[in-house]
């Protein structure tokens, strides 16, 4: 296992801090997070190398960069194999009142240009604020580099007069998506309980509260009303898996 042993001079302090964290995560077998830190630390070391004139220091830096790159590559191969075997699992715990968990912040890592189809299973896309949550999720998909063409939604049907509002809201979202070249297919189930989101690049995300994990804003003019990275969250758990194939709803 790689060790951070980087000399603490002003130029390399940032790199040393990130790489120290990478080694800690590595030792705890938190490989996805460790890989991110290794990659960031390597980029910082490369910047230090560009500004270093002393040949001895340059040689030492190249050696350290090579060592960290080897470790990062080994972790990447391990994670890729986990994905191939369908064993990959990452868990994120969102604490009560935590911020920084907008849909873009949570999902962007898993949305690349290969994503063309999305499946959402969530029994609670019914009330007005839940319809807005689904709309924000769709907006996020449209803005990402992926080329989503079809969105499948499986949810439960509201009761009474609220059913009209739910159907009308989803119809308006469907029409709006169609104007952007995206097909929305909605199905209803009275027995749905699970909440999960799947992309056709193999990623599957299960959120304990589904899309409805944001708290109500304190007022219409409080921070977080518009920017959901600033919106406090309810406590929930996010489980992320990777499978070679996703199933249809």
UniProtKB/Swiss-Prot annotation:
Altering residue 168 to E: what's the impact?
Strongly reduces binding to membranes
InterPro entries (alphabetical): MIT_dom (IPR007330), MIT_dom_sf (IPR036181), MIT_domain_contain_protein1 (IPR052817), MITD1_C (IPR032341), MITD1_C_sf (IPR038113), MITD1_N (IPR045331)
Q: What keyword terms does UniProt attach to this protein?
A: Cell cycle, Cell division, Endosome, Membrane, Transport
Q: What is the effect of changing residue 220 to E?
A: Strongly reduces binding to membranes
An example Gene Ontology molecular-function term: identical protein binding
Is this entry keyworded Isomerase? no
Mutation effect (residue 132 to A) = Abolishes homodimerization
Localization in the cell: Late endosome membrane; Midbody; Membrane
Stretches assigned to the MIT domain: 8-86
Q: Name one GO cellular component term.
A: midbody
GO annotation terms (biological process): midbody abscission; mitotic cytokinesis; negative regulation of protein binding
Record carries keyword Ribosomal protein:
no
Q: Region (Important for association with membranes): which ranges?
A: 168-231
Its annotated function is as follows:
Required for efficient abscission at the end of cytokinesis, together with components of the ESCRT-III complex.
Which PANTHER family does the record cross-reference, listed alphabetically? MIT DOMAIN-CONTAINING PROTEIN 1 (PTHR21222:SF1)
Provide the assembly information: Homodimer. Interacts (via MIT domain) with CHMP1A, CHMP1B, CHMP2A and IST1.
**Domain notes per entry:** The C-terminal domain interacts with lipid membranes containing acidic phosphoinositides and is required for location at the midbody.
**Protein name (record):** MIT domain-containing protein 1
**Lineage of source species:** Eukaryota, Metazoa, Chordata, Craniata, Vertebrata
Task: Write the gene name.
Answer: MITD1
